[in-house]
Amino acid sequence: MTLKELITRIQPLDEAAMEAARRRQDALAKPPRSLGRLEDLSIQLAGITGKVQNTMDKTHLLVFAADNGVVEEGVSSAPQSVTLMQTVNLTRAKTGASVLCKHFGAGITVCDVGVNAIVREPAVLDRKIAFGTQNIAKGPAMTREQAEKAILIGAQLAMDTPADALGVGEMGIGNTTTSSAVLAVLLGVPVETVTGRGGGITDESFQKKKQVIAQAIALNQPNGKDPVDVLQKVGGFDLAAMCGAFLGAAASHRPVVIDGFISVVAALCAARLCPTARDYFVPSHLSYEIGYRLALEELRLEPIFQLSMRLGEGSGCPLAFQVLSAACGIINDMATFDQAGIDDGYLEEIREGDKFTVEAQK
């Protein structure tokens, strides 16, 4: 499968199924739009799957692990060895994301696409492209061939994973640096507006981080109109594979949950490659990282939660899976007005005037 073939598999949402879901929601025994975002999600799910009634019996988080050569520049407080340790711990329900997956019964797959070490844990899926990327402050992160390979690895894993919904997470020291670089280029904005402190760094290191990102962009001159070029020159193997996972989920007609900052940048890359893919995305939480909101605004999406989270790993995805499940439960199991023995004639005027929309309350 080529990248072009992958993109051609992604189809627009099923408008007929969405309209049927809207009619079903209007027929349920409740004031119009009174379940708000849950109704919106159920309609989105109908468009994604082509079915009005869906389930979230099986949900799965995909975590892509890789190291980033830019850590040589002192942009992270954590040593690079943490990537390997946490990659292994993710498979043992010992990290934030994996504990949440275990708690809610979601599956998790950890995929090594570029850890700078030999990963001896059998539970980690080996798709290593190289032992980390090159230092973007000194040259391109990878070759274009490697970037496309990473995208297709992520896409194939998403398509091969049986689940009603997928989530996309990561593990890689230094990846807020690469994500900020990619986002700055895609949006054409100053580095300072999209660069946060990541896992936590001193003021001196924070200034260094911004300088390194600006230096990397100036040196490599990525083309902001070509997401693959941007990923190749200032991105990471994890980011590229995550981008592919978003595309793969859309190509296989499954909703795919965005986690935090790295995840939303990967989602934006996917949407730039195939704008239709955006309609399959479900943002989980409003990350505390500074660039997250800008990326989400560019995608024209709204997060479900605001929990001041900034862990990454995919930690927001298991929480969002529960909301998707609730959205399915509402449209599947609530009684209609007819079933409840209620005459809903009194709502006709309200329905026609959209008196229960958020805008109508202002």
Task: Report residues per predicted region.
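N-terminal loops that bind phosphate or other acidic moieties
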Residues: 2-362
